[in-house]
């Protein structure tokens, strides 16, 4: 399990260069307007969306897990707490097919608890 930080950036090339140096890490996935890093230390999934018009730099937060049982457990726990905003099964997003559950904090910050099933050649639905 690792925390995910998804950022809106003005220039994907500039951001990739900066974060590669900051974390001494190589890009795990690179597509037009998109990149992600799977960083071992500290355990972090860093996702970059080229989105210069975004009013906020923080896009959303998440927790990446590696087993569907963890997504189902999080869904049950969040549902019992009345916190589930949506559940997505086998949904393509960020050049990957994923199972996930979403919750929104009291200030409107979106959190996802997700597992990547497989890579995809397409980004998925339009970014927000």
Where are these regions (language model features)?
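A short linear hydrophobic-aromatic micro-motif
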Residues: 26, 46-47, 84-89
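Short acidic/glycine-enriched loop/turn segments that link adjacent beta-strands
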Residues: 31-34, 55, 94-99
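Short beta->alpha transition motifs characteristic of CBS
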Residues: 49, 95-96, 102, 113-120
């Amino acid at each position: 399990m690792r925390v995910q930080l998804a950022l809106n950036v003005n220039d994907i090339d500039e951001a990739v260069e900066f974060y590669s140096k900051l974390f001494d890490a190589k890009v795990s996935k690179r597509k037009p307007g998109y990149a992600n890093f799977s960083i071992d230390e500290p355990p972090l999934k860093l996702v970059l969306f080229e989105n210069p018009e975004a009013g906020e730099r923080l896009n959303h937060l998440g927790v990446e897990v590696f087993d569907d049982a963890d997504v189902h457990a999080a869904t049950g726990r969040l549902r019992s707490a009345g916190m589930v905003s949506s559940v997505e099964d086998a949904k393509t997003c960020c050049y990957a097919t994923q199972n996930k559950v979403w919750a929104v904090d009291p200030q409107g910050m979106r959190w996802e608890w997700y597992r990547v099933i497989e890579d995809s050649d397409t980004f998925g639905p339009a970014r927000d």
